[in-house]
Amino acid sequence: MFGYIRPSKPHLSEQDEARFQSVYCGLCHELGRKYGFAARFVLNFDFTFLAILLSDAQEPECESCRCAAHPCKAQCVMAHTVALETAADHSLVLAWWQLRDHIEDHGFFKAIPYRLAALLLRGAYRKARTFVPEFDASVQRHLNDLHQREREHCASLDQAAEPFAALMADIADCVDDEMRRRVIDAADDFEKDAHSNCYNPLRYRYELDGDKLDEQSREAVATSLDLSVHRMASAYALLSCGVWTSILDSIFYESLYGIGNAVLKGTYH
């Protein structure tokens, strides 16, 4: 579900790469500061992107910190901000419900790793939901909606993507709705879902029986993804992002296209 929204680092300047890394590390430290060490493991690029999108347009204040991942060399870490705290709160709640979703989707033995992870995060989740109770309720509601569509074997990509898109909409109302529609997750999980006999909207949309997308289906998904990214980029163009502009340009105009193509070709890692 997570990890697709990241900049194309080879095309970033050293300054922008360091700036992005400072936010990534800042979110990690914010998760640890507020929710404990185990919470750091829910860190992902998607909520780093959210923290950037919600940050002030000016150069962020940074601190020099060491951590378990970088014990020898201090890193430049974005100092505590409302944007980081918002990203941390929402990412913790969403990660918890993603674990619960995995537990429901897998058999007893295959779900053991997810049960253990949920046990470690239970206290952090209970704390996080007190800060964002409306979002916590929203996640439950939209995931129930998603499960209902899974049980119905919904063949519409738009309808299958809608619950998670609506969930993302509840995180940041300032972000245009087109920035939240994602089909790429279904394409990335297609083979895994086929082997485990889990619901995947692409399977029903294109009436596929195997564990691979055929060429015609792949082209149709690519067209849908390109259209979605184009509309997201159009919405993004209306924002004023200051020092974050180069990083966000890289995401909207390069990275999302590249990652989508890599997923469809089976070369994404």
Map each language-model feature to its residues.
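Membrane-proximal bilayer-interacting regions
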Residues: I247-N261
